[in-house]
Amino acid sequence: MASRFPKFSQGLAQDPTTRRIWFGIATAHDFESHDDMTEEKLYQKIFASHFGQLAIIFLWTSGNLFHVAWQGNFEAWSQDPLHIRPIAHAIWDPHFGQPAVEAYTRGGASGPVNISYSGVYQWWYTIGLRTNQDLYTGSLFLLGLAAVALVAGWLHLQPKWKPSVSWFKNAESRLNHHLSGLFGVSSLAWTGHLIHVAIPEARGQHVRWDNFLSVAPHPQGLAPFFAGQWGVYAQDPDSSSHLFGTAQGSGTAILTFLGGFHPQTQSLWLTDIAHHHLAIAVLFIVAGHMYRTNFGIGHSMKEILEAHVPPGGGLGRGHQGLYDTVNNSLHFQLGLALACLGVITSLVAQHIYSLPPYAFLAQDFTTQAALYTHHQYIAGFIMTGAFAHGAIFFIRDYNPEQNKGNVLARMLEHKEAIISHLSWASLFLGFHTLGLYVHNDVMLAFGTPEKQILIEPVFAQWIQSSHGKTLYGFDVLLSSSSSIALNAGKSLWLPGWLDAINNNSNSLFLTIGPGDFLVHHAIALGLHTTTLILVKGALDARGSKLMPDKKEFGFSFPCDGPGRGGTCDISAYDAFYLAVFWMLNTIGWVTFYWHWKHLGLWQGNVAQFNESSTYLMGWLRDYLWLNSSQLINGYNPFGMNSLSVWAWMFLFGHLVWATGFMFLISWRGYWQELIETLAWAHERTPLANLVRWKDKPVALSIVQARLVGLAHFSVGYIFTYAAFLIASTSGKFG
């Protein structure tokens, strides 16, 4: 008999129902649960799959470069970045009638095209690419890299090339290599690219492989480096009248500490960015030589952790036992990695608009909105994933004996206190914030707006002032003309910072008021509630008062029947599932706030946000309803326009989102009856009944239906907001 899917589970392969297919897909990546899985095989499989992941990433980025080179307008855009719209790729659609062809023929193209809102044009332009040939070269290089990654993945599954478990668990060597090699050397290489290629290109000097070795990036070459006069590299920076991409107004400095933005491109100075990467490189290369490997010098992670026992005894055995716990648990490591990556991704969202690194990005409003929203949603999914794997760690990998009395055990021992404090914070934030919004809403409705409760965020304003924002008149630290910090800083560091922070044409330290105070606390409510659900899910994953043996049921059980007072909705999976809704909700508030605040800034009408954001109807009417008008106007009695794709996607997103509820609300019995009725009809319909299937159709399990429902909810939610965001922004600013 031919082997049936899934090969990794004989038990499942023999299941006579359609559960075999769905459950097979669901557990395909849960390597730990597969037949004949050993620790060694597990590590090797994951290691090899990383190369596959890299290959996919390189192929994708290669495709971006290739399509822009083939169908885009990069060379034309480079000549006039502020007035030509960047093209992502052509649209070939046989359904397009003449009005559609006309509506989507933009950016100087000869046929219908998609406009790029990803920021890749600005990025490629900033790092020194100028021609389609450059893009093709990059695309081919990445394609080659993808092929190399695939070969490497295959190679490391061959018997002679499989690394051993001890190699995977050698934490110090891995730390050294990742710190020095991955972060350090790559940052150094990037500094090299910026200094040798990007900065000369920004000054009108074209450096490629043919003249790479003959053009010195600095007039004095390496002489100041060896003479120890490094300050020479910071002398003569580009002037404020510098035209990016030309020699006009350019200087010779390569490593600066100017602060602020290039006046024309409104982006960070390239010489500042090079300096930053050089500093990071030095830091990480040094850090990558700190841990003890074969040479008997340096730190041992285990010794450091074992020594971390607070002397007063107030924290028990401190970090003892943590080294082996972390080093032997892939879920713990993945949880830590996801937590870090999630925070970094959210920081990218924040910094890409407040300190734009790419030339002319700040003037491309739709791209800024898209990049911010994209990175915040990605961050949300990654962060919730960190807690999911934390919970799986507690169920599968946590050993109470090994961790007796240390910080991990103590977290579990006083989890009630942690959970109840988080619960209290969430309740406090929720009731007070909603109370203020509702009060203000009623006052507006009754025609007495002066009776609103409006609270100035004085502490946040004070912090902004201490960083140099003079608007509020606090006269403190960098915003005080008599401050030592200010006077010392003028000549020493970041002379451009104070100009930037007090300039209203950028997004650095936005002016804040009562509307910001309220929405800040609404977001804080969302963050605390999401965290509460995730933390409770992880800390109760092994067991709770209601269900002490929860660990035996695994990560994703639906119920254990009505005994014990009802045990549905209490698995670690259920907590994760609920938290994702809260995460999406919270990031909704974050992106609404960011977008509305910036629409006012970009349109020169900050009063609208300030006046309308203090009550609920203001958000519903003056943000959501008002800005959806262009969207709904994609198709109208006069035909269609280039917003029609977003109008359609807006409706389609709502459809997908609403489909989610069908899976989230109805129960298994309903589906089982429906499926049996459909199967009955199929078997009795001529022609259709020639097609048979071997598996007996059964409804999805409760857990699977939840996953399908959640997936539709998430995808629909994000599709809907993406369409709204891009249409409302591009409709206003082109």
UniProtKB/Swiss-Prot annotation:
Annotated GO CC locations: chloroplast thylakoid membrane; photosystem I
Enzyme class: oxidoreductase
Cofactor binding note from Swiss-Prot or TrEMBL: P700 is a chlorophyll a/chlorophyll a' dimer, A0 is one or more chlorophyll a, A1 is one or both phylloquinones and FX is a shared 4Fe-4S iron-sulfur center.
An example Gene Ontology molecular-function term: oxidoreductase activity
Membrane spanning stretches: 46-69, 135-158, 175-199, 273-291, 330-353, 369-395, 417-439, 517-535, 575-596, 643-665, 707-727
Residues that coordinate or bind phylloquinone: W671
Domain of life (superkingdom): Eukaryota
Gene Ontology biological-process entries: photosynthesis
Pfam families in alphabetical order: PsaA_PsaB
Residue sites binding chlorophyll a B3 per the record: M662, Y670
UniProt cross-references to PROSITE patterns, sorted A to Z: PHOTOSYSTEM_I_PSAAB
Annotated localization: Plastid, Chloroplast thylakoid membrane
Residues reported to bind chlorophyll a B1: H654
Residues the entry annotates as binding [4Fe-4S] cluster: C559, C568
EC numbers, comma separated: 1.97.1.12
The keyword Phosphoprotein is annotated on this UniProt entry: no
Keyword terms of this UniProt record: 4Fe-4S, Chlorophyll, Chloroplast, Chromophore, Electron transport, Iron, Iron-sulfur, Magnesium, Membrane, Metal-binding, Oxidoreductase, Photosynthesis, Photosystem I, Plastid, Thylakoid, Transmembrane, Transmembrane helix, Transport
Family statement: Belongs to the PsaA/PsaB family.
Function of the protein: PsaA and PsaB bind P700, the primary electron donor of photosystem I (PSI), as well as the electron acceptors A0, A1 and FX. PSI is a plastocyanin-ferredoxin oxidoreductase, converting photonic excitation into a charge separation, which transfers an electron from the donor P700 chlorophyll pair to the spectroscopically characterized acceptors A0, A1, FX, FA and FB in turn. Oxidized P700 is reduced on the lumenal side of the thylakoid membrane by plastocyanin.
Subunit structure: The PsaA/B heterodimer binds the P700 chlorophyll special pair and subsequent electron acceptors. PSI consists of a core antenna complex that captures photons, and an electron transfer chain that converts photonic excitation into a charge separation. The eukaryotic PSI reaction center is composed of at least 11 subunits.
UniProt protein name: Photosystem I P700 chlorophyll a apoprotein A2
Biological source species: Staurastrum punctulatum
Lineage of origin: Eukaryota, Viridiplantae, Streptophyta, Zygnematophyceae, Zygnematophycidae
